[in-house]
A protein has these predicted regions:
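Eukaryotic alpha-helical solenoid repeat scaffolds
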Residues: 1-113
């Protein structure tokens, strides 16, 4: 899949997730944002998807949804707490794509690891 196709697919998922047309847990519950679990292509996909979701929902709402206790599977997958390196990678990923505001709970968790 080329970059244009990745962007189109990510945009579709962003719109569906932002509209709650598909379940966050079902889509994002298995997405671990770590160096080992992602590739450059998957990071492009995730970057576009989360940036478009932020445009549609706003960063605050997106952050609340990603870190919601009712969606703990999503939070725990996106911000793995198994070790500091994985947590830091996820925080750095979101910060690098301009969404550092969604990382505050993960930053607090990192200080406890």
């Amino acid at each position: 899949m080329g970059t244009d196709e990745l962007r189109a697919a990510a945009g579709l998922f962003a719109r569906l997730l932002a509209a709650d047309a598909i379940p966050w847990r079902g889509v994002l519950g298995g997405v671990r944002i770590t160096e080992e679990d992602t590739t450059s292509s998957s990071r492009i996909f995730l970057k576009v998807m989360f940036q478009e979701m932020a445009e549609q929902l706003g960063v605050r709402v997106l952050g609340r949804r990603m870190n919601d206790d009712d969606e703990s599977e999503v939070r725990d997958a996106l911000f793995p707490g198994d070790n500091a390196e994985n947590t830091r990678f996820a925080i750095n990923f979101f910060t690098a794509i301009g969404l550092g505001g969604v990382t505050e709970p993960a930053r607090r968790m990192l200080s406890l690891l």
